[in-house]
Amino acid sequence: LPARGWVERGQKSGGMFGGLAFSRSASNDPTLTENFRRWFGDSKVVDSAGKPLVVYHGTKSVITEFDGSKTADGGFHFGTSAQANMRVSGEGKNLMPVYLSASSLQRSKDLGGNWKAKIKAAQASGKDGIVYLNRYEGLSSEVISRLSGEGLLDKLDRMSDTEFRRAVPEAEDSYIVFHPTQIKSAIGNNGNFDPANPDIRFSRRK
């Protein structure tokens, strides 16, 4: 997935935060700013290098604030662009690139949906999101054909994540977060990254 680099070592006029330097300007890279770092915190939604990961939400709507009352299971779902693309069919689809602030993720097994009970359990245990190795979305037709030829398509639910990763090395994680303020747009954001404002674009303090 495309992610924006955020670590910049050395003394900068923007000041230091946690041993890393952050610019006060979002003109070049918003993930370098102090505002972003305050909002992002110790989020675990990062790439293999530990940098903030851009993930995607597929929809046919124009969303400025996510609304939990409009979800089937109470969670907001994100993944790779290929995964998000598979969640929406037909014309007018919109793939929204975002960053997620989730520092306490519950690792769960993908059984092809029915996340409502798992979301409630994760919330009850104090988690702020769920991460899972996606077994059903974002796989190419070539991978599906290979799995079918190997007789594995009917065995996906029974596989452990380790077994699935071995069978499908290109598989990627997906994420579910519970609160609108955990989501900020990766494009068109004014740079405030206000943790109290659910608007994903402007995030202006009120």
Predicted regions and their residues:
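Active-site and NAD+-binding cores of ADP-ribose-processing enzymes
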Residues: 1-206
